[in-house]
Amino acid sequence: MTDSLHNAPIVLDNGSGTIRAGFAGDDVPKCHFPSFVGRPKHLRVLAGALEGEVFIGQKAASELRGLLKIRYPLEHGIVTDWDDMEKIWAYVYDEGLKTLSEEHPVLLTEPPLNPRANRDTAAQILFETFNVPALYTSIQAVLSLYASGRTTGVVLDSGDGVSHAVPVYQGFTVPNSIRRIDVAGRDVTEYLQTLLRKSGYVFHTSAEKEVVRLIKESVTYVAHDPRKEEKEWAAAKMDPAKIAEYVLPDGNKLKIGAERFRAPEILFDPEIIGLEYPGVHQIVVDSINRTDLDLRRDLYSNIVLSGGSTLTKGFGDRLLTEVQKLAVKDMRIKIFAPPERKYSTWIGGSILAGLSTFRKMWVSIDDWHENPDIIHTKFT
């Protein structure tokens, strides 16, 4: 086991919508795929046509999608089905990385303010089932800041399951200032599905919901001024060029109008879908205002975006406008939107796990057997 502690650590970015895995020190993850498990929903009539009862990875996400009932084991950053989570991790090791789990320490990412039980079970499975030699868990947003080359800033990380704002100053997180809302990309997909149904386009199976996710990624945008945009649509003055056309897998064409900006609007106004959460702009300002007065100016001038939902067209511009409305007058606000922000959590993990000092940060399997609570006392 001592030898395995010297091998390159594996960075496992365990996202609610996408899992990314690879070796520390690499520039990009070696494998990434939607973090769902697919099971055949029809009776098998041809022996040997499809081997296995469970399908994971790119094959399940593309060519077999229509045959499968799809389930995500992670909801809002919390694992709701550990059996399926274990299957996904096994697939990562066997097919994605083609390596043995017991030969590499692991850096596992997680959202902030997650239940302790989630980390306990993750550690138990990785140590007991996969026999990993050592484990370290890190908050996703902090890793995104490392990837941007900064040690000070507030990261707004909005992925598929969770959106959170995390202030970091000179490499230290300010725990009492972290803000989290369980509104993110999957909620946008579900709301778009509802809006399309009202327009006469019905997507009801779990596989068709994946099609809606692809539509969302392709055509949605965040309106700079949603009220003005709504008025233009109501008055039918909207430029026909604003109507997007999307070709469905069966060749039919879908015309999408105001749904394009109405769906992602829930990130800024979750009350649209009946959720009593503040918007993403509000959690950024709240998290900064909870820090010491001396830190705020530096944080406002270093707002870093991370996660797939921030890639929505117009997101950064709208965020800047909304933060300016809430911030102190004449405050200098700068938002950084790294082009690789879909992977920035993984990249930050690769940087951190590649440092020689990383060995001092992790918990070895022996330490964990002696005291399982060490994963809470040693990691923030």
Curated annotation (Swiss-Prot):
Location comes to: Cytoplasm, Cytoskeleton
Q: Which UniProt keywords apply?
A: ATP-binding, Cytoplasm, Cytoskeleton, Nucleotide-binding
Its GO CC terms? cytoplasm; dynactin complex
Q: From the record, give the cysteines joined by S-S bonds.
A: none
* The organism's place on the tree of life at top rank: Eukaryota
InterPro entries assigned to the protein according to its UniProt record, in alphabetical order: Actin, Actin/actin-like_CS, ATPase_NBD
Alphabetical list of Pfam families matching this protein: Actin
Cite the GO molecular-function annotations of the record. Answer: ATP binding
Q: Which family does it belong to?
A: Belongs to the actin family. ARP1 subfamily.
Q: What does this protein do?
A: Involved in nuclear migration. May function as a component of the dynactin complex which activates force generation by cytoplasmic dynein.
For this entry, the protein name equals Actin-like protein
- What is the gene called? ro-4
